[in-house]
């Protein structure tokens, strides 16, 4: 579609049913002109925020389709998840997850303080940071790349310093408004089951 290609979100049920496929990072393009143009002009994300994540090797442009590539890492710095977002602005945008990605390590940033902001998609996370830039690198953020709670539960496990969960980012930026009540309820149930953090909504 408009030169974009990939696969759409897959449910957690499908992750369990499918035979695991090898995880391979998409090949990088030699420049990031289309990614910067799309994120800055179409999504109004601050250049400094984009560059910060680029320097962390968390955002780049793929060579084949010029999608934005969002990379999620595990605690030892190994890439474990890739979400791709098309840069074409006409028609239905492509969004997809690379085969073999571990949903526990979707696009996220751990800054070390005691609150985590939760979002549905990486674009929403970057938009929020662009709006609230003061001391942003001290905070924690996670993009679920869908609506399952795997990545939220993982960032809480890996960062015991986090005591509060801010649902506001998820509620304000989600495109799937009809599912927010059930998602919030599922988070609360998961946290109760694990004896984990307070809600900071």
Please report, for each region that a protein language model flagged, where it lies by residue:
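A general marker of short, structured functional hotspots
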Residues: 5, 11, 19, 34, ...
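Detector for Asparagine
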Residues: 2, 29-31, 67, 74, ...
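Phosphate-handling DNA/RNA-contact segment within nucleic-acid enzymes
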Residues: 61-158
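A generic structural signal for short, well-ordered alpha-helical segments in conserved domains
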Residues: 36, 125, 184-185
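TOPRIM fold recognition
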Residues: 130-201
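TOPRIM metal-binding catalytic domain and adjacent DNA-binding surface shared by DnaG-type primases
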Residues: 1-68
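Glycine-centered flexibility motif
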Residues: 56-57, 96-103, 177-184, 188
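Short, Lys/Arg-enriched charge-dense amphipathic segments
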Residues: 14-24, 28-30, 34-35, 70-84, ...
